[in-house]
Amino acid sequence: MVKLTMEPVTRIEGHAKITVHLDDAGNVEDTRLHVMEFRGFEKFLQGRPIEEAPRIVPRICGICDVQHHLAAAKAVDACFGFEPEDVLPAAYKMREIMNWGSYMHSHGLHFYFLAAPDFIAGKDRKTRNVFQIIKDAPDIALQAIELRKNALELVRATGGRPIHPTSSTPGGISTELDDETQKDLLKKAQRNVELAEATLELAVPIFEENIDLVNSLGNIETYHTGLVKDGVWDVYDGIVRIKDKEGNMFREFKPADYADTIAEHVKPYSWLKFPYIKDLGYPDGVYRVSPLSRLNVADKMPDAAPKAQEHFKEFRENFGYAQQTLLYHWARLIELLACAECAADALEGDLSGEKFPDSLERQAGDGVGIVEAPRGTLTHHYTCDENGLITKANIVVATIQNNPAMEMGIQKVAQDYIKPGVEVDDKIFNLMEMVIRAYDPCLSCATHTIDSQMRLATLEVYDSEGDLVKRI
């Protein structure tokens, strides 16, 4: 047995490593994605007042903090007896604007800083990074920074702060927009529509030039899951829709019923669990949540996003029910445009209505909140007692749900490229990393750090006795 190790996986949010196990003939026997980080936020929440949850859980992550805040807020709403449609309309719309702003920030970060170097900065490991893009194409870098800055202003105004928002309250929201601020945010959202279109104009030809790689690298067939509202793409509210491997409707369920459909498998080498559809078992029930999944399960984009709808229509005509892993990047940019259009449309409307309920009554029991985080479906489930204290918390993040698919994807790359007699180098491992990057996994949170020395990428080769043979 020979073991190949790549540590860390680069240009992702967090720290992971890949190990490839070869038999004595040099054939791939097994491929594993190891996640070494551990969080205990569910335990942190126990004993805390339920209304504190939306202020605590954003610290799980500095990138998808808004979605943790909103999923928690929706779970808290339920514990106070509010259905999503009971939230005051102006507050509901403010929460949506916060969500769209966070999406633009996250999707912009992923494409320009994490994914684009694989397609723009060349194949040399030393230049395959955002710094090379800044050097070779400073205009593109400035475009990325402007897009993300505008997006964070939307989050700041609606969430109370640009990172780790605090504004959502039971059944409402605490922030207000004066006329001047709303007009300024509208201009920023409209500018982001232009920047999102420019990003698609830049990216689509690159994807088309690499279509052979798109159609071959790490592709697997799975079920896909995402929120829809009356069949329309939605990232804040709706029902959960699952489609099977052929794109047929498999199931739709209300967020509160998620535990009836989803189960988790455990493997000893990773802190992450391996979710699957309970009725189908593991691994037959492996599913994905992602920008691509959301496009796959939706019938159309919102009426407020006509430009994104045109891109969605073209994407569907070209790829149908898409399973190609690298198409995540394309789908992500269609969503980037949709979020900018939806935010601009909302900011043109009236946001001056009441944003806080007249009365609140805490209820003992369970509350479940589901939103679509940039990486996929996010669930917060809290149980509270008669005093309003949390007795149990369960948080199911997108990356956990994509964990089985990521591992299956890198296994396929290893089997396709690692053969007896073929020297395994950085280029092959980068292809595995490209598969993982497509999912945009979020493995770390804002309260954890990695020693800087661990950021140096190494490729290690061990012999059948477990001795180190070579380090690259």
From Swiss-Prot:
Ni(2+) binds at C61, C64, C442, C445. One of its GO terms (molecular function) is nickel cation binding. The keyword Lipid biosynthesis does not apply. Gene3D superfamilies: Cytochrome-c3 Hydrogenase, chain B (1.10.645.10). Keywords: Metal-binding, Nickel, Oxidoreductase. It is an enzyme of class 1 (oxidoreductase). Its cofactor is Ni(2+). Its EC number is 1.12.99.-. Disulfide bonds: none annotated. Belongs to the [NiFe]/[NiFeSe] hydrogenase large subunit family. This is F420-non-reducing hydrogenase subunit A. The lineage of its organism: Archaea, Methanobacteriati, Methanobacteriota, Methanomada group, Methanobacteria. The gene is mvhA.
